[in-house]
Structures are given as structure tokens and as C-alpha cells.
Amino acid sequence: MTQDGTWVDESDWQLDDSEIAESGAAPVVAVVGRPNVGKSTLVNRILGRREAVVQDIPGVTRDRVCYDALWTGRRFVVQDTGGWEPNAKGLQRLVAEQASVAMRTADAVILVVDAGVGATAADEAAARILLRSGKPVFLAANKVDSEKGESDAAALWSLGLGEPHAISAMHGRGVADLLDGVLAALPEVGESASASGGPRRVALVGKPNVGKSSLLNKLAGDQRSVVHEAAGTTVDPVDSLIELGGDVWRFVDTAGLRRKVGQASGHEFYASVRTHAAIDSAEVAIVLIDASQPLTEQDLRVISMVIEAGRALVLAYNKWDLVDEDRRELLQREIDRELVQVRWAQRVNISAKTGRAVHKLVPAMEDALASWDTRIATGPLNTWLTEVTAATPPPVRGGKQPRILFATQATARPPTFVLFTTGFLEAGYRRFLERRLRETFGFDGSPIRVNVRVREKRAGKRR
């Protein structure tokens, strides 16, 4: 640590740990309703930020989507859902099933109804199901912005759910009173709370239709995310608490990344932005790659995103069962060649569809996170540095050979090292040092960073 302390600041990752330790214990509030009644707008209003994908097209939200929320000092989880229709078909039927699961598993439910449209057959069907659930149910009469809207809201008493809360999710009207009522009915701890403490956060990322939702469903053992043959059927990050190998993991299943965020349109653009945020909020990322197809620029870009974010990395080659035996050995060599810069990444060949080798993902994540958490004491680190630089000194630059005076590990998560030198170190030499660090200390599955601080010349002392 230097005198000004600029290189040693562990407060960020310690705060991360405390936030993670709190997850899983909060009660859950599900927000349900027909398509395009304003559920995601209400969720964003509750959160005080844009998290849920919102667009003026019915059915933009297709999954149950969980977000951590805070209101008047009380923690809870708000669960956005796809539009609920009792007689839906195809993909919309799958979405309706997700909303039905949310109704059953939440600690309280907010049913959102468009006050201007009035109670529809779908609203009445939802009300009947909710009344049978025995859960606290709150009726939110949305899009109330006038006296006529107040009258429209009052007409929703007919649903039998008690007094309608007249709100405008768009403008915030009435939302505070609604939340006060909801929180008063919530238990201190959710029924489905995890008792194992803070789960490690995992982001599932990859290009569209590579099998992220299928993998999540295989791990969870239920139809947790909407899976359909159309590419990109998951458009929001979906948090799932899943017990694997005796530990609870928090999976974030993200929308498939488009070729370029700037080229995506509508809700696909917003979903791409949320994918970036999912990687940032995770500790380890599983990058799914289609083993039956050549590695693409999209695949490489996703891997780069994870490395740039400094997250532990597992490469999961999905659809391995579709690769011929004769092709597999050749494919392994191709992977080594194309991903030469990330040979340190954990690699697992799986089939999300059949479950082949999926169990190997947990030890791969555990190893990657152990490397990500690693701290090397200053003594052994500088002993290693002395031996390496004696055998291979830094290259001469501008007629002078820089010396490395001292090294320290500034932070973990990812492991970040600072070298104090008398001159600039070439990028190639820094990569050499990174390779030697990995050979000696491991770090399999984790990016590491090597930063250089050039010692400033001190002014001569006054006599």
C-alpha cells in the first residue's frame, strides 16, 4: 500500500459481500395482470429506476423477473411477470403459466388492471384464482389521471378484491399509498427465503437461442424461464435461487445479446442494456457457446464483456451431444487456437437439453470463484517477482532498463496487482508477467489485472 492509499481500497468488494449476504431472505411481491396494463411501469416506479423493460407493445415482459426493492427502510423482492391470459396459446400460454406460478409462490400479489378499459374476462379469472390462493391481494387500478379515471377505478369493486387503489404508474400517483398497504401485509421473511446465507451470483450469457433458458430449467428442475423455438424469448434478466451441490446459487438468465446493442430496436435494445448490467451484478459468468456451430464474433464479444467487467469465467460449450465423435478432438484444438488469450477460463462441454455434464458446472464455478477471491501475501509475491525479473528482466526502453521495485496485490475480485517501477513496462512484458503469475499461483477461471505505477523522481533536498 502506498502512502496515499490509492491502490488499496477493499471497501467496494466488502460492500458487495454484505449486499449478497442479504439476498434471498426478503418477502416477495408479485405484480400480475393482463398484457400492457402497466405492470413493468409500476415495477420501475417502485424501484425508482428503470429496470424492467417497458414498451408500448403488449407482451414485452415474458418471464417472471425478480428485483431487490426498498421502501421506507423495508427490503422486499418485487417480481414482474408476463401478461396473464386464461385461454392463451403457444408462447403466450407459457407466459401465462409463469404468471400463475408467481401468484402461487409470492407472499403478496398486486393485480394491475387498466381502469380505463374496466374489468375484462381475464381480470375476473385472475381475481378468482387470487381469492383462492389465500395470499394478501391488492388491486391496482392503473392509468387513473382524471376524475373520470377515479370513477372507472371505483367500478373495479366488482372484482371482489376489496377497495381498488387508484394509481398512475406512469406519473407516480397513488403508488406510495399502495406500497404502504402492501408492506403492512408482508411477513418479515419470505416463505421461500433461502436459509443458507448469501448465494453467489451467476450470470448466464450468450448469443440468442444458444440454450440459456434450457440450461436454467435443467438446473432448476422446473420450467423457470419461458423457452420457445423463437430466438430471444427471454427479454429480461430472471433471478433464480437454485440449490446445487448443497449450496444456493443466484442465477441471472439474461436475454440473448444481439450483434450490436446500437443496432437492436425497441425492447431488444433495452434487454441488451440489461444484459450488460447482469454481468456487472454477477460474480461469475457462464458464457454459453453453441458447440455445433463455428465460434462467432458475437461469442468473442460476450467473452470480452465478462473479462472487461472483471468477473470469474466459465465457458460452457452447449449442444455437445450434436458434435460427432470424430469432430470433437478437432474442435478442442480449434477452441485452444481461437481462445488462446483465455486458456485460463474454466471449460465444460455440456448439453442443456439432455443434461450431459451439467453437474460439472458447479465445481467449475467454485474453482473460478476461488481464484477470483484469491489474495497473495506481499512477501511471497515479491519473492516470486525477484526470481522472475532476475531470469527475464524488463526490456530496455529509450536506452534505459526499467526496474520493478515492489509489487503488491491491491484487491481481489478480480485479483489486481500493482507494480512500482522506475519506468514504463511494455504491454508484452506485462502479459509475460501475467502468464508467470498464473503458472505460479493459479487463478484458473479468473481474469487478473497487472497495473504499473512509475515512481516519480523526487526533487533534490535543500541544503
From Swiss-Prot:
Which processes are annotated in GO (biological process)? ribosome biogenesis
**Keyword Transcription regulation belongs to the record:** no
The residues that hold GTP 1 are: 33-40, 80-84, 142-145
Write out the residues that bind GTP 2.
Answer: 206-213, 253-257, 318-321
| Origin superkingdom | Bacteria
Q: Which InterPro entries match?
A: AAA+_ATPase (IPR003593), G_ENGA (IPR031166), GTP-bd (IPR006073), GTPase_Der (IPR016484), KH_dom-like (IPR032859), KH_dom-like_a/b (IPR015946), P-loop_NTPase (IPR027417), Small_GTP-bd (IPR005225)
State the Gene Ontology terms under molecular function. Answer: ATP hydrolysis activity; GTP binding; ribosome binding
Give the matching Pfam families: KH_dom-like, MMR_HSR1
Q: Where is the KH-like domain?
A: 374-456
Which residue range or ranges hold the EngA-type G domain? Answer: 27-190, 200-373
Coiled coil location: none
Give the keywords, sorted: GTP-binding, Nucleotide-binding, Repeat, Ribosome biogenesis
One Gene Ontology cellular component annotation?
plasma membrane
Summarize the protein's role. GTPase that plays an essential role in the late steps of ribosome biogenesis.
The record's family statement is: Belongs to the TRAFAC class TrmE-Era-EngA-EngB-Septin-like GTPase superfamily. EngA (Der) GTPase family.
Its quaternary organisation is:
Associates with the 50S ribosomal subunit.
* Name of protein: GTPase Der
Q: What organism does this protein naturally occur in?
A: Mycobacterium tuberculosis (strain ATCC 25618 / H37Rv)
What's the name of its gene? der
